[in-house]
Amino acid sequence: MSEQLQPQQSMNAADEIIGRPLAQGLGEQTAMLCAERSITYRELDAATNRHGNALRAHGVGKGDRVLFLMDDSPELVAAYLGTLRIGAVAVALNVRLAPRDVLYVIQDSACRLLYIDAEFLHLYQQIAGELEQPPQVVVRGDEAPAPAIIAFKHFLDGQAATLESVQVAPDDVAYWLYSSGTTGRPKAVMHAHRSVLIADRLEREYFGIKPGDRVFTTSKMFFGWSLGHSLMGGLQCGATVIVAPGWPDAERVMATAARHRPTILFSTPVMYRNLLREGAGESAAMRDIRHFVSAGEKLPENIGQQWLDTFGIPITEGIGASETVFLFLCARPDAYRIGSCGKRVPWAEVRLLDELGNEITTPDTPGLIAIRMASQFVGYWKLPETTEKALRDGWYYPGDMFSFDADGFWYHNGRADDMLKISGQWVSPGEIESCASAVPGIAEAVVVAVPNDDGLTRLTLFIVPEDPSASQQKLSEAWMTTLRGTLSIYKCPRTIQFLEELPRTATGKVQKYRLRDMLQATL
């Protein structure tokens, strides 16, 4: 059973995130580093309050949605926390949205106010004329280009640096996360104020993060992985959060590490792969990092092993979801298995179920996972049927297949709707992908299936080679030898296709539906 939180009658998420370090006397401790800037907890609290007061002055109140189309910055953090502090709902958006997606999200959320960076303002301006009820717009970076748009500095002019938080019920909605859309249009995942009560536990209990530590998350803050374990968890620990503007790439990550010297790095499998390619093993700053943590998608075993060989420190793998914000399974630095996403964390309950809903207790038996934890979402915005399917009797059913071994280590076998029946037998794409990724010269491997002309399902393996100039024939032969020597014949893909890179969402997850579309177009 998970550890139960003591019930609270009222609270505010912003108080839990930055109120704790302030109550511990850490007001002069550095809360954030961003390029040349250093912001203390006292300064962050004051900026948070100014934003909260400004939002109120512009008619934003409890339950109103506030959207953020902003690059990561101290201003984003302060505005986000200010939104929470007045009981409004904070919604950080992917800064790479197309104009039509910006239109969709504004209409879907019925937002009251939009914070936007000047560099992204053109996205809004392209669709503003289609909005029947346009939000108030606050732009950071330039003077307001039109009377209907408010310049950032004018928005905050004269606003007090003190503000009493609005106390809300723990189950009141605090923020949304738009899902990354691996299968289509994203959903707004609604989270309650209570979700932040466990924000610091992974950092504290698994990695010993405390004041003086520096937390660096390579993903952008609109992604739950970064929002939960950087903005929320890192600050709640009283640590220093490294804020890195700009779209992340390996070179930029290493430059940020060299400048700010993080003690823990939260990242994704694709970034760890790119860091290895970029020569991260030669970086003194990277070698000084105590802990490396990975989530977002399954970490290929070859990347995990290469990292361990290079740094002598494992990548600690875990798994969470937009619907839980925080990880529900995670390895420990001193208790891990390459290829596994770890064990159940103490603050979550996890069950494995068969097709009839019976709990699976036998190791190495695939089943559907069910999760219950304090941070799980309260529902999908305006999608009651989808919510009812995912949330049942207090448990969250993500539709993912897992198994666990005799020692309690869990393994992600892919989405339940990705499970394939080949020659009358169920096949896990994850098993095939792990096997293919172990072949020397293969950087990434993804399996998808489409029906052939005969109506039968056939597997295709998409491969990204480590060296684009490598012989595809030799890689194909090595792949076939390895798979046929490891897997049952019905699990071996019939065809192989080479790609320079896999299609991904902005948060790094592979978009398998686009690969299926590619195959369908060739039939």
From Swiss-Prot:
Catalyzes the ligation of 3-hydroxybenzoate or 4-hydroxybenzoate and CoA at the expense of ATP. The enzyme shows low activity towards benzoate, 4-aminobenzoate, 3-aminobenzoate, 3-fluorobenzoate, 4-fluorobenzoate, 3-chlorobenzoate, and 4-chlorobenzoate. There is no activity with 3,4-dihydroxybenzoate, 2,3-dihydroxybenzoate, and 2-hydroxybenzoate as substrates. One of its GO terms (molecular function) is ATP binding. Optimum pH is above 9. Belongs to the ATP-dependent AMP-binding enzyme family. Benzoate-CoA ligase subfamily. Induction: By 3-hydroxybenzoate. Pfam families: AMP-binding (PF00501), AMP-binding_C (PF13193). Its EC number is 6.2.1.27, 6.2.1.37. The gene is hcl. It catalyses: 4-hydroxybenzoate + ATP + CoA = 4-hydroxybenzoyl-CoA + AMP + diphosphate; 3-hydroxybenzoate + ATP + CoA = 3-hydroxybenzoyl-CoA + AMP + diphosphate. The keyword ATP-binding applies. Keywords: ATP-binding, Ligase, Nucleotide-binding. This is 3-hydroxybenzoate--CoA/4-hydroxybenzoate--CoA ligase. CDD domains: BCL_like. InterPro entries: AMP-bd_C (IPR025110), AMP-bd_C_sf (IPR045851), AMP-dep_synth/lig_dom (IPR000873), ANL_N_sf (IPR042099), Benz_CoA_lig (IPR011957). It is an enzyme of class 6 (ligase). It comes from the Bacteria. One of its GO terms (biological process) is secondary metabolite biosynthetic process.
